[in-house]
Amino acid sequence: MILLTFKNILSNGISYEKDEDNLETSIVNLKSKKEWLHSQKIDDLLDYFDALGQYWKNNTDKNFGNNLKYVSEFLSRENLVKELKISLRGNISSLDKFVNLFDDNEFSYHAQPRGISVHWIAGNVDVLGIFSVIQALLTKNLCLIKVPKNYSLFKNLILSLKQVSTKKIDGKDLVNCITLIYIDRNDLKNQEILSKNADIRIAWGGKEAVSTILSLKKNFFTEDIIYGPKYSYAILDSEFLKDNLKDSAQKLALDVSIFDQYACNSPHTIFIENDDPNFSIVKKFAKELSNSMESVNRLMLPKSQTSEKKLMEILSLRAEYDFKGEVFASKNMDWTVVYSEDEGLANPCFSRVVFVRPIKNAEEVGKFHNRKIQSIGLGISNLKKQEKRIDF
């Protein structure tokens, strides 16, 4: 007997939560919503998502998760317009109609939706998947979403779209443009059906998960968007820290804590440019960062449940650096700041574990760079020095 691994969680705006044996039927139903979504005006969609952001901001609770308030900031009309202008050559009206290209009457362009965007959402921080879903809907692409095994939070977020309506858009109609399914990671047959029906494949997750998705057969013109295992870090110099030590520690503690470092732009290593042989400013910063980590965890973003495997990994790492450095940590496993004089970028542990390391000259980090680097946070006292430090 072969167990069904395809579960229809949400389609046609209705929560089903039942096993089914025909994934193609769900896909056909979703495609029927294409015309409605394509007909919506970008201004109306912007109004809707701005209102949704306000709704989420005012209703952040255990049903939606602690990180939602930061997602809501992304949904502000001002931010979404800025993001769209970057991608659409400055004219967001191109999503609705043909517009002149660079004020040239001889050439026009119209940004057409691709069709069905298929999202493989990672299980470690499922709220992050909302970013790609919102952007897909905003550009009028239907969303077929393979959720992780623990999908209740993500499902609650999608269903909450029904609670928001604006003058032109009823959230219930927008939810009809989304289908949620669960497929076992080893069910490559149904995974391939997803892939072959995708006009865009959007993959969230680690290297192994993303590689599996990319290996699936797809149509020739299907495009891939990868939210894979990127790495971010920060560089501060001692001159900058003279006046900004506490403020920098607070901001970095928040960056580390949001999404528990599973977001690509969360720092894992913080370099302090320092010529003091005693590294006093580096140690002082590590201590201040630990105070801020505790405050963020207690007052703003309480740590969510952590797997036993990750707890053991953190415990082992703390024991290692008790001998070769200095560890500032919570009494439990909520957060960990590791000071050491090791060279280079630390291997990421995630789960609010951040490394603070001295570096004699910030330009040295250039030798550690590769395509995996996503973001660099800078706290450099001099603008010219700042530009030089990041031009690797």
Which residue ranges define each predicted feature?
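N-terminal Rossmann-like NAD(P)+-binding subdomain of aldehyde/semialdehyde dehydrogenases
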Residues: 1-114
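Conserved small-residue-rich beta-alpha loop and adjacent elements
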Residues: 96-165
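Donor nucleotide-activated moiety binding/catalytic core segment of transferases
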Residues: 102-121, 182-192, 334-350
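Short His-Asn-centered micro-motif
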Residues: 119-123, 146-148, 183-184, 203-206, ...
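Short, aromatic/basic amphipathic alpha-helical patches
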Residues: 157-163, 212-217, 284-289, 384-392
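Conserved NAD(P)+-binding/catalytic subdomain of aldehyde/semialdehyde dehydrogenases
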Residues: 170-276
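NAD(P)-dependent aldehyde/semialdehyde dehydrogenase
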Residues: 250, 258-377, 387-392
